[in-house]
């Protein structure tokens, strides 16, 4: 039957209710339910073919010269060995 018997689950449930309270558990349950609904909706939306909007002509804008985001860069550095402290339980 595993580690937990039905009696163990009842005790765990009582402890959880005492710690968190019914109000917080109710809010948690509704949040989980909404998350599941959103997930199912997203999965169903993925199954439907997406309507392709007509492509809008875009004007090509030249990238500014010297843009740091588009330029490759290299970082020159050396690694330094760090002395690890001696653990007391290994002595």
Curated annotation (Swiss-Prot):
Which family, according to UniProt? Belongs to the TatA/E family.
* Keyword terms: Cell inner membrane, Cell membrane, Membrane, Protein transport, Translocation, Transmembrane, Transmembrane helix, Transport
Q: Which organism is it from?
A: Pseudomonas syringae pv. syringae (strain B728a)
Tell me, what is an example of a GO biological process annotation in this record? Answer: protein transport by the Tat complex
The entry lists its GO molecular-function terms as: protein transmembrane transporter activity
Its function?
Part of the twin-arginine translocation (Tat) system that transports large folded proteins containing a characteristic twin-arginine motif in their signal peptide across membranes. TatA could form the protein-conducting channel of the Tat system.
Oligomeric form and interacting partners: The Tat system comprises two distinct complexes: a TatABC complex, containing multiple copies of TatA, TatB and TatC subunits, and a separate TatA complex, containing only TatA subunits. Substrates initially bind to the TatABC complex, which probably triggers association of the separate TatA complex to form the active translocon.
Composition bias of kind Low complexity appears in: 51-64
Q: What is this protein called?
A: Sec-independent protein translocase protein TatA
Q: Where is the composition biased (Basic and acidic residues)?
A: 78-91
Location of the region described as Disordered in the Swiss-Prot/TrEMBL record:
41-91
**What subcellular compartments does it reside in?**
Cell inner membrane
GO cellular component, alphabetical, reads:
TAT protein transport complex
Q: Which InterPro entries match?
A: TatA/B/E (IPR003369), TatA/E (IPR006312)
How does this protein sit in the membrane? Single-pass membrane protein
**What Pfam families does its record include?**
TatA_B_E
**Membrane spanning stretches:** 1-21
């Amino acid at each position: 039957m595993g580690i937990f018997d039905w009696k163990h689950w009842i005790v765990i449930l009582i402890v959880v209710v005492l710690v968190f309270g019914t109000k917080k558990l109710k809010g948690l349950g509704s949040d989980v339910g909404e998350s599941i609904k959103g997930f199912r909706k997203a999965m169903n939306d993925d199954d439907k073919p997406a309507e392709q909007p007509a492509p809008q002509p875009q004007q090509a804008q030249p990238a500014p010269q010297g843009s740091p985001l588009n330029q490759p860069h290299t970082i020159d550095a050396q690694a330094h060995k760090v002395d690890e402290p001696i653990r007391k339980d290994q002595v």
